[in-house]
Amino acid sequence: MTATPWGFRDILPEEAQAREDIALTVRGILKGHGYLPVETPLLEHRDALGGGGRIADTPFKLFDDDGRFLVVRPDNTLPIVRMVASRLDAARLPLRLRYDAPVVRTAPRNTGASRQVTQLGFELIGAGGIE
C-alpha cells in the first residue's frame, strides 16, 4: 500500500522546509517575549481533558492495556491546561508557554481537508489581562 489514509499526507522537502522556516521565526519571536517550550503527549486520557467540545469530536479514540479511554489530541490548549494544573500548579505566574505539535481533527470526507495539522502557538496563563 502506498497511499496515506484519507485526510493525511506526506510533507515533501520543499514544503517541510518552508514550514520549518516559519516555525523557527515564530519560535524566535515567542522566545524573545519569554515564552518557554513545552511538549505534551500525543495521547491523553479522555477524562483528563473533559468529555465535550473538541475532545468529543476527535476521530481517533482507543483504549490502553488497562482499559482506560484515550484520545489522540485534537488541540494543544487542553493538554497544556492539564499539564499546568497537574505539574506546574506551584509555578510563578504568569506562565508563558509555547508549543509546536501535531493534532488530529475531524474533517469532512472528499473535501481535501487535512485531519492532521501542526499547531504552533502559545498560552499566557495567570496574567491579569492581555500584555
Q: Which residue ranges define each predicted feature?
A:
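TRNA-recognition modules of translation machinery and tRNA-sensing kinases, especially anticodon-binding
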Residues: 1-131
